[in-house]
Amino acid sequence: MTVINPGGNMSDPIFHNFSSAPTHVAPFSHAVESDGWIQITGQMPTDPDDDSAPLAEGVEAQTRRVMDNLIIVLEGLGLGLEHVLSTRVYITEFKRDYEDMNNTYKSYFPEDRRPARTCIGVTGLARDALVEIDMVAKRPD
């Protein structure tokens, strides 16, 4: 894990990168934290152990891989899905894949503890992925 806090103040951002998380597909940190609020970069359905492996077939398998990759980042932060306050889902084939993505996504959260969410149809994602999800989490006080 790499943690960089340039200023050392609580309000200064802390940039988190984890060797256990998937390889970056662009120049970003896995998560950035300030005052207990954590922005978690959108994860792709890549294999964290083999970035060169082909992406899983279908939106259900890709959604599972994305959620599992997000859990890796959360665990690196010492957090879990119960600390997630909101998510944004980006999906390339909205009409075709929304229902299957949604059914897979909701299986990760208890019905009475689902984060706020926005779902956005996009024209493309890195590596021709079908889905990408980012999160906002908060450390307990």
Task: Give the residues covered by each predicted segment.
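N-terminal presequence-like segments and the immediate start of the first folded domain
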Residues: 1-68, 72-85, 91-141
